[in-house]
Amino acid sequence: MTIQLRQICLVARELAPAIADLTEILGLNTCFVDPSVGVFGLENTLVPVGRNFLEVVAPIREETAGGRYLERRGGDGGYMVITQADTRNSQKAVRANALANGVRVAHEIERDGWSLCQLHPGDMVASFLEIEWDRHEDLSGHWMPAGGSGWEDKVCQAVTVDFVGVELQGPDPEALAALWSAVLGTPVIQDGQNLSLRLNNAVLSFVLQTDGRGAGLGGVRLAVRDREGILLRAKARGCPVTDDQVIICGTRFCLQTE
């Protein structure tokens, strides 16, 4: 069973400023807007990061799940870990693992040649976990949330190359890691105090919440080619920075030089 980290979704109070920060600071392009998220009271934009994607959603009406999440976590931040399964059977296995561990299915779509399963963030503790499959079974190509194809010419890796990992935080990192391990069918790797799961192309790390925002998707690790340029542009746009990290859309982006 192979599971690819294909997309990371952030949630923001306002879409345009978040997308402007992400694209200008990280040297990325927008590639797709999905009108179907309007049924959830949201608007969105997707940005390719290598052959994978960063998405931002924002509420366009009151009383939405995204709006409640913003209130609960005190502002913009991480929202969903979105994965792609190599086969339909792999997707079904993750879904079965979730149900066996008391995790509810929050939303499902079944269409000819495409299937989506979202697992409830209340049960996954740190974020939604979404598992998608489509008949192309191409982990670096066709991707339904980005319109299938047509996004490829928007890929720019001159500054930001790809995802390396995601940081999930909570009050009990060991329990959080064990839960995600059971659902994804991937063993926990323990290196001293560090807990992680390895997906096909990225690592999920589990850490103690220390920022006062509670459990959530707290950070994204990126492979980059121009860390200094990223930090300079982030400072110019008023985003908090350290020597190897910038906070954009309420999310810690750790910059790992290639």
Write out the residue ranges for each language-model feature.
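Short beta-strand
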Residues: 35, 107-110, 189-190
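Vicinal oxygen chelate
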Residues: 4-13, 45-47, 55, 67-165, 196-198, 202-208, ...
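Intrinsically disordered, low-complexity segments enriched in Gly and acidic/Ser/Thr residues
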Residues: 174, 178-182, 188-221, 225, ...
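A short beta-turn/loop motif at secondary-structure boundaries
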Residues: 36-39, 110-112, 212
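Surface-exposed interaction/gating patches
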Residues: 4-5, 9, 149-193, 202-203
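An N-terminus-focused feature that recognizes amino-terminal "leader" regions
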Residues: 1-64
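Amphipathic alpha-helical segments
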Residues: 16-29, 92-101, 172-187, 236
